[in-house]
Design a protein with these regions (language model features):
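Repeated scaffold domains used in trafficking and secretory/extracellular systems
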Residues: 144-151, 193-206
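Short glycine/acidic-enriched loop and turn motifs that connect beta-strands
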Residues: 166-169, 220-222
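Long amphipathic alpha-helical scaffold segments
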Residues: 104-151
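Residue-level detector of Asp-centered blade-edge/turn motifs that repeat once per structural unit
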Residues: 154-155
Length: 235
């Protein structure tokens, strides 16, 4: 079972059933841009992946907001599993247009977050629901101050950790820490801001020496679109 990879927000006026057009990104019907949820979604996704969260047989959760259901109701989508694209599921969430538009931005974000939480309960087992709830509460409580562990490695002489905060503008702000094997902090370096994909490409492979550390970039073709270079640290 793969770790969760993505959560996306869609909308559709009429009921979403087979042989009808797919929902579109949440941008017009409710006067809300799905990008205004990306800070919460990215903090949640990176926290969940670190904790090993899985939805089971798929890894992309697609929320479909529709006024065709009672406001706040969340249920399985009638399309079911797409045999050609089995890695995603649409999940329907009732969202009354007038009620939603009358909410403040904070109330709208809270409502959308809670519907995602309800959707997870339709698919995840008890252990993964507990993981989700734990991560969700941290995201809600700490927001942009939440430091999310990303990678770590222990060598013969050093231990290195990479964590990140995610700003309200969805900038990734990595922190590299190097410890000796007794847990004493030897170096802490707060990096420049990165976009999500750039962050993933930059912090790929960790190599540790006696007094040195190197973080190599991804060899993915996508790396050529960014001005990123290997990172080297000396104690």
């Amino acid at each position: 079972m793969d770790l969760i990879k993505d959560i996306r927000l869609f909308e559709k006026l009429e009921p979403d059933v087979s042989c009808t057009s797919l929902p579109t990104y949440m941008r017009g019907l409710y006067g809300f841009d799905d990008m205004d949820m990306q800070d919460i979604i990215q903090r949640l996704l990176f926290s969940l992946r670190h904790e090993g969260f899985t939805l089971g047989s798929f890894d992309h959760l697609y929320m479909n907001y529709t006024p065709s259901l009672p406001h706040g109701e969340v249920r399985l989508n009638q399309r079911g599993r797409d045999p050609y694209f089995p890695w995603y599921r649409f999940t329907d969430a009732g969202c009354d247009i007038d009620i939603f538009r009358a909410m403040s931005m904070e109330e709208q974000r809270r409502f959308l977050s809670e519907t995602i939480r309800k959707a997870v309960r339709l698919y995840a087992d008890e252990a993964n629901i507990a993981i989700f709830d734990r991560c969700y509460e941290r995201v809600v409580e700490l927001g942009a101050d939440l430091e999310i562990p990303y990678k770590e490695k222990t060598g013969e002489h050093l231990h290195l950790t990479i964590s990140t905060t995610i700003s309200d503008e969805v900038d990734f702000l990595p922190i590299v820490r190097i410890f000796d094997l007794d847990g004493r902090l030897l170096l802490e370096h707060r990096m420049r801001s990165y976009g999500r994909d750039e962050f993933i490409l930059q912090f790929r492979t960790i190599t540790l020496g006696k007094k040195t550390a190197k973080i190599a970039i991804s060899k993915s073709q996508d790396a050529r679109y960014y001005d990123i270079k290997p990172l080297k640290f000396t104690i």
